[in-house]
Amino acid sequence: MTKDLYDKLMVFGNDREPFLTHNFMRTTDLDDGTATVTLPMHTESLNRWGGAHGGILFSLCDVAMGMAIMTLRQEMVVTVN
């Protein structure tokens, strides 16, 4: 991955995507084919039993997968079902 793409993805993953910032997700590391995205748990992210809500966990997986794919494709992509 180029330095330029790395920088763009880090800005996108940490500052530019409203859904990610709203849900406190942070991209902490990127490499070719991999992405580390962290998700601190907040009360808004929990289900009624106090565990992580399944929707937020799937969102985390979707974000990490999309970021990892972008490192290989060398371009911005959108994930779809």
Segments predicted by a language model, with ranges:
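Terminal targeting signals and extreme-terminal segments of soluble enzymes
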Residues: 1-81
